[in-house]
């Protein structure tokens, strides 16, 4: 699953390519799973909107939209299936007519969660449409913004008036003391606490393992046994790992690519994640794997206590 660095990389790439562009038309595929908002609401909100900003919030990509309230209320929707370009097969989907009353807010947000295998790509119109494409937004510039997701765990939704808010604290902004206070009284393993998105948003399996290694803490260690000084070290490790990963474009392990379809390189810097049985890069002790709360965790039994 794309984590904070991957989502941040995609958001930054999109911001460079699509901010200021306008969405002329939207095509939706036939699969309902990716749609967290009604299809008609997504189409009526996106079409005609100008993209004013793209940013990350936790593991979500938030695309800020602007349009006049008059335009929002007056635009008449056609059937979603007719949005396919000439030459692309049209998809019929029962009950997914776009005839519902469109949103009249002048500000809205298009929220994308990539799930396990989701990709949000900027493409030229002549780029071949991949099999698992669920949304195509045709832009005024001539480019297209496509959402592709083979496993369909990703989600697309819209929110009015900037109402969307992700739970949890932002790991790149939080200071050491509030970070410590989030976790110190919890009896759960520190790895499980780091993955709790209601506490700290955006950190997933990869970056929790890498951060705990740099902080010298075993993933199964109870948060209540960790000292304030150790939490300060963990805070610094989390921020350093995330920033390094963003610089290298994230970790491409399975399906992840950025907005231009390019892979990241931070997987080449992993010190423990995915390295079970391989020698620790610090002490040469074989890296171990443990299952904690149903998630694989990788650690060095000598460097981490």
Protein language model regions, located:
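Structured catalytic/nucleic-acid-binding cores of DNA maintenance enzymes
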Residues: 1-305
């Amino acid at each position: 699953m794309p984590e904070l660095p991957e989502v941040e990389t995609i958001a930054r790439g999109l911001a460079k390519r699509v901010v200021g562009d306008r969405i002329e038309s939207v095509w939706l595929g036939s699969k309902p799973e990716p749609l967290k908002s009604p299809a008609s609401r997504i189409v009526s909100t996106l079409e005609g909107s100008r993209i004013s900003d793209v940013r990350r919030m936790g593991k979500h990509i938030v695309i800020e939209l602007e349009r006049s309230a008059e335009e929002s209320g007056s635009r008449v929707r056609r059937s979603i299936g007719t949005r396919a370009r000439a030459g692309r097969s049209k998809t019929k989907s029962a009950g997914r007519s776009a005839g519902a009353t469109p949103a009249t807010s002048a500000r809205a947000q298009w929220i994308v969660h990539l799930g396990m295998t989701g990709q949000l790509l900027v493409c030229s119109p002549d780029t071949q449409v991949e099999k698992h494409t669920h949304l195509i937004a045709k832009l005024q510039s001539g480019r297209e913004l496509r959402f592709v997701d083979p496993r369909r765990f990703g989600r697309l939704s819209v929110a009015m008036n900037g109402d969307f808010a992700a739970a949890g604290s932002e790991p790149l902004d939080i200071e050491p003391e509030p970070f410590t206070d989030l976790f110190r009284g919890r009896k759960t393993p520190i790895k499980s606490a780091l993955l709790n998105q209601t506490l700290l948003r955006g950190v997933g399996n990869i970056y929790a393992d890498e951060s705990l290694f740099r902080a010298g803490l075993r993933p199964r260690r109870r948060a209540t046994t960790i000292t304030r000084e150790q939490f300060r070290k963990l805070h610094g490790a989390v921020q350093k790992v995330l920033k390094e990963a963003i610089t290298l474009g994230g970790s491409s392990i399975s399906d992840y690519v950025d907005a231009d379809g390019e892979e990241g390189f931070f997987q080449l810097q992993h010190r423990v994640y995915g390295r079970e049985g391989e020698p620790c890069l610090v002490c040469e002790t074989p890296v171990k794997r443990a299952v904690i709360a149903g998630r694989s965790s990788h650690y060095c039994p000598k460097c981490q206590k």
